[in-house]
Amino acid sequence: MAATTNAGRSMASWRRLPTLIAAFTLSWASSFVAAAGSADYFVHDLPGAPDGPLVKMHAGHIEVNPENNGNLFFWHFQNKHIANKQRTVIWLNGGPGCSSEDGALMEIGPYRLKDENTLVYNDGAWNEFANVLFVDNPVGTGFSYVDTNAYIHELTEMASNFITFLERWFALFPEYEHDDLYIAGESYAGQYIPYIAQAIIERNKNAGPVNHKWNLAGLLIGNGWISPKEQYEAYLQFAYEKGIVKKGTDLATRLENPTALCQLKITESPDKIDYTECEEILQDMLQQTAGGVGASGKPQCYNMYDVRLKDDYPSCGMAWPPDLKSVTPYLRKKEVIKALNINENKSTGWTECNGQVGLNFHPKTKPSITLLPDILSSGVPILLFSGAEDLICNHLGTEALISNMEWNGGKGFELTPGTWATRRDWTFEGEPAGFWQQARNLTYVLFYNSSHMAPFDYPRRTRDMLDRFMGVDISSIGGQPTDSRLDGEKLPETTVGGAAGNSTSNQAAEKAKLEMAKWEAYRKSGELVLVIVIVAAAIWGWFVWKDRRKTAGQGYMGVATGERHSISTNPSGSRQGNVSGRTRGQGLEGFRNKRSGRRDVEAQDFDESELDDLHLSKPEDPHADSRYSIGDASDDEDGQKPEKSSSSGQAGRS
C-alpha cells in the first residue's frame, strides 16, 4: 500500500511539472522581455538619411495618463562622444501645442532636411557631447496623443505627466538615469521648463534606493515666454528700437494706449500668464505696420520671429522658417512613421502645432518667473539666450525680467550694490557673435543677427554655448577646437563640427551596447523564448519517461490523463473615436496658436498593445465618443502654426 501511495504521489508530481515549468518559463521570459524593452523603440533606419553610420536613436510612445490614453512621443539621439562625463539634454518646443520635432529637424538635432526626401548632417548638432531627447509635450502635441476631451489645462498637470514620462523612460533606458540632466527649449517652453525643474527638485527630496535622485544640472531657455509683465511691455519698446514704429507718431499713440491698458490689467491681476488685452498689442502692431504689396499680391507685414523679413499679411511669419515646408511632408511619410514606431494606420499625421492644445490650456498657476529664484538658489544654474531680431519673445523683455528679478542675495546682474556684471563681447571664429553676462548662477547670452530660433540660424554657435554651459572637457576627445572668445580672451577649447577621435570610455560603452543589441534582437525575433520552451519540453519528457520506466518496474502502468495546461491571454480591443471640431483664431490665435487650415479628421486611435512595455492597465471604455488626438491643427486661414502660448490659444511658438 505504501508503495502504491508513493508511486501515485510521484506520478502526480510529474503531471504537475508541465505547469510548473510553463510558469517558470513564462516568468523568466517576461522578466527578460521587460529588461530588454528598449529594443521595441530602436530606430533601425531613417528614410533619407545620408550615407554613413546612422546615429543611434530610439523613438516611440510612453503612456503617462492611462485614464485618458495620454501618451508622450519621444525621439532620442545618442551622443557621438563622451567627454569628461555623461550628459543628457531634453529639448522642448513651446506653443503650447508645438512639436519638438521642430527642434529635432530644424534646430539642434543631428539631421536637417535638404528637401522633403533628403536628410543632411547638421554641423553643430547638440548630440556631439550629450544625448538629446526630444519630447512632444504636453499630450496632444505633435506625435503625442490623448483623448480629445482630456487635454491638460495646468502647468502643474503638465509637469506631473512629464515626471511620469521620465520615470518610465529611465526604466526603459536605465543607462542614462545617472547622466547630468539638462532641460532646454524655447518660447512657451519658458513656462514648461521651470515647472518641470521644480517638480524634479521636489521629487529628489523624496528619493530613495529605488527612485534615486536625478542629477538636474542646468536649464537653458531660448527666447522664452517667462514674465508677462516685462515681456508684453517690451513689444512697443522693441518696435521703437528697430524703427518699426516711430515715437511721437499717431501710430505710436495708438499702440501706447493698449500698452498702458495692458500694464493696468497686469497690476490688477499680477499672477496670470496671458492677458487678452495685452495680446492685442502685437496683433495691432503687425496689422498697422503692414504695407506694400508682395509677389503674392497681398500686403506685406513684419515677420514676428525675425523682423528683418517680411511676409504676407496676416501670416506675418507663421509659415517660417523655410525648412517647415519639407518637415511636414517628411514626417507624414508612411516609411518615416513606421521607422519612428508610430502606428501609421491610426494617426492623423504630424502637424507642427495643435491649436486644440493651446485652446484647452488655461493655466491658473503663476508665471514661471516666480519659480526661477528658488531654482537658482537650489544650485541649478540657468542660461537664458535670445536672438536679437525676434519680436514675439524679444530680448528687451528678457533683459528687463532679469533686471527686475531678485535671487541669491542680489537683484539683476549686480555683483555688489551699484555694480553690475559687465556684458562681455563674444566673437566666434573672428566674427562678432553677441555678448555674455553672468552673475550668481544665471547666465544670459544675446545672439546678434538671430531670430526667435537661434539654433536654426547658428547651430555651431549655440552648440558652443551649450558645451561651455555644460563644462565639456575635450582633453580626451581631440578634434579641431573652435576659436571662441569673450572680450578677446580665448575660452576653454571645445570642438565644433565633429571631434576627430573618440574616448576610450565611449568605445567601451559602444561595445557593451552592441552586445546588448544582439540580445534584444534575439528577444525580438522570439528565438530565445522558443529555445526555452524546447528545453523545458525536453526536460519534462525525460522525467515522464523515467517515471514510467520506474512505475513499470513496480508493476504499475502510466495512465494518460485528459488534463490540459494552458496559459492564455485576453486581447483587449482597440479604442476608437473621431477627432472632431476645428479651432477658430481669436486675437493672436491666428499668430501664435498657428498651424491651422485643413486638418485630418478621420477616426484615429492607437493600438495600446504595441506600446505596453511600461503601460499601466486601463479600464475599458467602449463608449468614449472622442478618442485619441494627435496633432490636430487649428483652422487659421493660412494653415500655419501657433506660437508663444496662451490659455486663449494666443501665443508662443515652437
UniProtKB/Swiss-Prot annotation:
Domain of life: Eukaryota
Chief location: Golgi
InterPro entries named among the record's database cross-references: AB_hydrolase_fold, Peptidase_S10, Ser_caboxypep_ser_AS
Catalyzed reaction equations: Preferential release of a C-terminal arginine or lysine residue
An individual GO BP term: proteolysis
Record's keyword annotation contains NADP: no
Any one Pfam family match given in the protein's UniProt record, by short name: Peptidase_S10
Topology feature Lumenal, residues: 30-524
Keyword Lyase tagged: no
Subcellular location: Golgi apparatus, trans-Golgi network membrane
GO molecular function, one term: serine-type carboxypeptidase activity
Residue intervals passing through the bilayer: 525-545
Signal sequence, start to end: 1-29
Biased composition (Basic and acidic residues): 612-626
Cytoplasmic side: 546-654
Topology of this chain in the membrane: Single-pass type I membrane protein
Family: Belongs to the peptidase S10 family.
Name the record gives this protein: Pheromone-processing carboxypeptidase KEX1
Originating gene: KEX1
